[in-house]
From Swiss-Prot:
It comes from the Bacteria. GO terms for molecular function: quinone binding. Coiled coil: none annotated. Keywords: PQQ biosynthesis. The keyword Zinc-finger does not apply. Disulfide bonds: none annotated. Functions as a PqqA binding protein and presents PqqA to PqqE, in the pyrroloquinoline quinone (PQQ) biosynthetic pathway. It comes from Pseudomonas fluorescens (strain SBW25). Monomer. Interacts with PqqE. This is PqqA binding protein.
Length: 91
């Protein structure tokens, strides 16, 4: 089954992406706690705005990091994990 890159990711209600100085990195805050994101996840998370589709997120990161092999597949994998963990919805 292939991933539909035309889908638009949105952070779920109650979840907030932000930079947390105490963690020295980006986190995802939610009612039960916090998830510290690694650098790659933070870059992807910063582009989730409820307006861009996954293809646009891939295109933007490809501009910032040209020639990175399998960039699109890595972003798709992040989206699948984030959806499975109920961090995002995909419209």
């Amino acid at each position: 089954m292939s991933f539909d890159r035309s889908r638009i990711p949105t952070w779920r209600q109650g979840y907030r992406y932000q930079y947390e100085p105490a963690q020295k990195g980006h986190v995802l805050l939610y009612p039960e706690g916090m998830i510290k994101l690694n650098d790659s996840a933070a870059l992807i998370g910063g582009l989730i705005d409820g307006e861009r589709d996954v293809a646009a997120i891939i295109a933007e990161l490809d501009k910032q990091f040209p020639g990175v092999p399998e960039l699109g597949e890595d972003i798709e994998q992040f989206m699948e994990v984030a959806r499975a963990e109920h961090w995002i919805t995909l419209a």
